[in-house]
Amino acid sequence: MCGIFAYLNYHVPRTRREILETLIKGLQRLEYRGYDSAGVGFDGGNDKDWEANACKIQLIKKKGKVKALDEEVHKQQDMDLDIEFDVHLGIAHTRWATHGEPSPVNSHPQRSDKNNEFIVIHNGIITNYKDLKKFLESKGYDFESETDTETIAKLVKYMYDNRESQDTSFTTLVERVIQQLEGAFALVFKSVHFPGQAVGTRRGSPLLIGVRSEHKLSTDHIPILYRTARTQIGSKFTRWGSQGERGKDKKGSCNLSRVDSTTCLFPVEEKAVEYYFASDASAVIEHTNRVIFLEDDDVAAVVDGRLSIHRIKRTAGDHPGRAVQTLQMELQQIMKGNFSSFMQKEIFEQPESVVNTMRGRVNFDDYTVNLGGLKDHIKEIQRCRRLILIACGTSYHAGVATRQVLEELTELPVMVELASDFLDRNTPVFRDDVCFFLSQSGETADTLMGLRYCKERGALTVGITNTVGSSISRETDCGVHINAGPEIGVASTKAYTSQFVSLVMFALMMCDDRISMQERRKEIMLGLKRLPDLIKEVLSMDDEIQKLATELYHQKSVLIMGRGYHYATCLEGALKIKEITYMHSEGILAGELKHGPLALVDKLMPVIMIIMRDHTYAKCQNALQQVVARQGRPVVICDKEDTETIKNTKRTIKVPHSVDCLQGILSVIPLQLLAFHLAVLRGYDVDFPRNLAKSVTVE
């Protein structure tokens, strides 16, 4: 949903122009998450002394694209872009409207007052903001926006106005604020009262910190500092400890005595360091590959160029520190290259992405599968009584697509659940269930809530994600990283096929010791081996599919029909068309045709049917004849070796043959391409469809 980016340079001189360029570039890297407005907050004034400028915060906010914000920044007449800052914190945000319409006043950063004493950027939803707003209004604080976030900015100002001591730290104020908040949030704060300091925190929404320095860092594992006495508003003292040691002085900066020197992260030899706060790694990878992923209720503070991480209270299972991790992502992976859009690039990356999903895991010489993330739990999974796959959107369709092969190879009942419905029903979950959570981002709010629901009931939890360090990958007992590479386009393509392959690999791993399954396992593994080449063959049909799109783009609706392994393909193809073309589209189980959908069929209704040479072939042929009998003119996606269907149908898209349980990967790609070309012909932004976000981090 919303995108957070902040940049702090400490003793690394940067001009205001360079700082703003970094902030704008960070927002551009987060555009794929979906947004309707954007804003930046930075030090104003044109003094040569950075500390004087830090006492004046300037906000620039704009409805629309980041490009419009960039243009607005350069329109400022009274702003010297060449002023140099030795220390500076700038924060930036792309907003997805949840409370209040898209407008500059509702955009972030939100401010505490007209003097911009405190500003904050926020991703998430505060559920008790009305109560907080009512309280703050009773104390004389005036509100100018309709957002829930403004209550946070006003609340930190209230905490500051009512602090018990001049030495109360920025971190302490933020801790007091988040104790009052209910809901989900990732927050970064900036204040004129604490120049050069940044405080970030999260609960339920992702936040990471990138670190860049030319010098050796003091540690690669930051200990968590716990408050040894619960902080209360109006309390006289604040004490901190890490494993029994005090780690903070009264001003909130790190006490670097011999005992406490490892409680902060800082450059050992020099003070020069840069920090980047962001919603995800795509915004920081061009600056640094060293990052710290924050956990729920972490409060990260940068004071005097030193980073420390705090928590209000210790709970069972808390990890004692946060590791500095090295990202493997490369900048060119998130660039478009020679393609017109990220979605097009990601569709054409699928031959490589499925190889990356299988690399090091599938041995085609001895027909073995090794999923390292599941190795320690595979015996427990094999003893379970039921598999439950929980997901949303495209990830849900990946579960539906592989349900049949999972049931066949594991001989277990398999449920595939939409996360929101799963939670609404309070679905019974037992200790001998194994629950899978599928999410490209690893941050999908409903799926994450489902994970916590299942953990409370004692089930073994397995994550299937594309994002290292995501909430789902951290909170599950074990999992599989699909290794599809960064997916920027809002409409998921390569993540779907990689999730599909990952679940098939899991099914193969589950039955590796069953003699009765060996021939079937070998057949599927040979299919996996040939899959990348077959995907390339399907992609070579792009011109043919573009021609079909020119015939359909003026239509208002399209029906997609299939059954068996291809019901999920119908659902996924219809979703892609809905998402980026804004055409009504419906995925229909061909077995349900006579139970209502057949009434929609006439000579004007576009119909796409998927008919493959598998166990449902005869029934799909019956459905085809019913559509033709109602003057329907279906386009049939079929096996290129199916001469009967090709001969009896006027329009076909012929895909190569694969093993039945993998054929859905080859049949979905023409629908991905069709959706892409329809959107282009209709004049829409393929990567950023209206009203949609890449990562849905609120319920």
Swiss-Prot record:
Under which EC number(s) is this enzyme classified?
2.6.1.16
Q: Which GO terms describe its cellular component?
A: cytosol; extracellular exosome
At what positions is Phosphoserine found? Answer: S103, S261
One Pfam family in the UniProt entry:
SIS
Keyword flag DNA-binding: no
Q: Could you provide one GO biological process annotation from this protein's UniProt record?
A: fructose 6-phosphate metabolic process
Q: Where is the active site?
A: C2 (for gatase activity)
User: From what superkingdom does this record's organism come?
Assistant: Eukaryota
Q: Where is this region: Isomerase?
A: 313-680
Could you confirm whether the keyword Phosphoprotein appears in this record?
yes
Q: Where is the Glutamine amidotransferase type-2 domain?
A: 2-305
Give TM segment ranges: none
Keywords tagged on the record: Aminotransferase, Biological rhythms, Congenital myasthenic syndrome, Disease variant, Glutamine amidotransferase, Phosphoprotein, Repeat, Transferase
Q: Which residues bind substrate?
A: T394, S395, S439, Q440, S441, T444, H595
What range(s) does the SIS domain occupy? 377-516, 548-689
Pathway named in the protein's UniProt entry: Nucleotide-sugar biosynthesis; UDP-N-acetyl-alpha-D-glucosamine biosynthesis; alpha-D-glucosamine 6-phosphate from D-fructose 6-phosphate: step 1/1
Q: According to its UniProt record, in which tissues is this protein expressed?
A: Isoform 1 is predominantly expressed in skeletal muscle. Not expressed in brain. Seems to be selectively expressed in striated muscle.
Catalytic activity of the protein:
D-fructose 6-phosphate + L-glutamine = D-glucosamine 6-phosphate + L-glutamate
Which terms does the record give in the GO molecular function aspect?
carbohydrate derivative binding; glutamine-fructose-6-phosphate transaminase (isomerizing) activity
Q: According to the UniProt entry, which disease involves this protein? A: Myasthenic syndrome, congenital, 12: A form of congenital myasthenic syndrome, a group of disorders characterized by failure of neuromuscular transmission, including pre-synaptic, synaptic, and post-synaptic disorders that are not of autoimmune origin. Clinical features are easy fatigability and muscle weakness. CMS12 is characterized by onset of proximal muscle weakness in the first decade. Individuals with this condition have a recognizable pattern of weakness of shoulder and pelvic girdle muscles, and sparing of ocular or facial muscles.
Q: What does this protein do?
A: Controls the flux of glucose into the hexosamine pathway. Most likely involved in regulating the availability of precursors for N- and O-linked glycosylation of proteins. Regulates the circadian expression of clock genes BMAL1 and CRY1. Has a role in fine tuning the metabolic fluctuations of cytosolic UDP-GlcNAc and its effects on hyaluronan synthesis that occur during tissue remodeling.
Query: Subunit details for this protein?
Result: Homotetramer, may also exist as homodimers.
**Protein name per its UniProtKB record:** Glutamine--fructose-6-phosphate aminotransferase [isomerizing] 1
This chain is encoded by the gene named GFPT1
